[in-house]
Design a protein with these regions (language model features):
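N-terminal glycine-rich anion-binding loops that anchor highly charged ligand groups
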Residues: 24-32, 67
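A short acidic Gly-Thr/Ser loop motif
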Residues: 7-12, 132-138, 203-206, 277
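Flexible N-lobe loop architecture of eukaryotic-like protein kinase catalytic domains
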Residues: 70
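Helical "lid/coupling" subdomains associated with nucleotide-phosphate turnover
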Residues: 3, 17-20, 38-66, 79-128, ...
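N-terminal basic/disordered segments at the start of proteins
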Residues: 1-26
Length: 291
């Protein structure tokens, strides 16, 4: 039996159709559409973005149904949590596809990211595991174990889209703008002290893009190397060089800064990109897994 999740993020709206295989998830299809949900001065997502989002979610739901899915879960994260017109937005999506939108709290987002990260590991370690989820609107840090689930978490408003909108005004970003973004990240992480872990799993677009663009290397030097490329030329040129979507490239410097700082909060324990994250966690929950 297949199950599907549509994840409405700050930068992208993603569909995952998956099946459960011996307690693990197997991806059937995954699709993403870039759509920035940027609030206006009054905190509202503009009407044109709401209409575009409703159309995207409806298209994702139709695709899921083509794969035999009747159980489609639509979830919203930081951008919708913070929007002053979230009720109208959710109503528009519901009207377009007939599926209610579940607005996740920061705690739920952290728990589901942890569940999803573990769901795609062939052999999860028995000891403490950390998870870093750098999204578009927020960043979650989580620790826990396979046996006990989440034992500690924090959610902070330092997602890649949020940081880029506030600080990265130039193309390519200037060093002074990166310093501004890093200063905000440092303030958000002040006093954040995760329990010790033997492994840290990174989920979210910034992490997977780093792994792809960096040739799979996950170390501080790989972050610095990719940042150097992103600062050397406009986003359109860097996108061609790295083989990435230009909108992803525009947000990547901020996401990498947040990932690097969050990794530092864990003492830079070994870092591995996990194939699963929030969407996989939602599907696991639907299948009767943790969270």
């Amino acid at each position: 039996m297949n199950c599907a999740c549509v994840d409405i993020g700050t930068n992208t709206t993603r569909l995952l159709v998956a099946e459960r295989d011996d307690g693990r998830l197997r991806e059937v299809v995954a699709v993403r559409r870039f759509l920035r949900l940027v609030p206006d001065a009054g905190g509202q997502i503009p009407p044109d973005a709401v209409a575009a989002l409703a159309a995207i979610v409806a298209a994702h739901a139709r695709m899921a149904q083509q794969y035999g899915v009747s159980d489609v879960h639509v979830v919203g994260t930081a951008a919708i949590r913070a929007a002053s017109n979230r009720d109208e937005l959710c109503a528009a999506v519901h009207s377009a596809c007939g599926i209610p939108v579940e607005i996740l709290s920061g705690e739920q987002e952290a728990e589901l990211a942890f569940t999803g990260a573990l769901a795609t590991l062939a052999t999860p370690p028995a000891g403490a595991i950390g998870v870093i989820d750098v999204g578009g609107g927020s960043c979650e840090l989580v620790t826990g174990t396979v046996a006990d689930g989440v034992t500690w978490w924090r959610s902070m408003p330092i997602g890649s889209g949020t940081l880029a909108a506030r600080h990265l005004r130039s193309d390519p970003p200037e060093l002074a703008e990166l310093a501004e973004a890093r200063a905000e990240i440092d303030v958000a992480l002040e006093g954040v002290d995760p329990p010790a872990t033997e492994l840290v799993l990174a989920v979210g677009g910034s992490a997977t893009t780093l792994a792809a663009a960096g040739g799979g290397e996950l170390e501080p030097a790989s972050i610095a190397r990719i940042l150097a490329v992103l600062l050397a030329e406009p986003a359109a040129e860097a996108a061609k060089r790295l083989g990435l979507h230009v909108e992803r490239v525009r947000l990547l410097p901020a996401g990498l800064l947040a990932l690097e700082a969050a990794w530092g909060a864990f003492g830079q324990a070994p870092l591995q990109v996990a194939r699963g994250g929030l969407r996989e966690g939602v599907v696991m929950r639907a299948f009767g897994g943790r969270s």
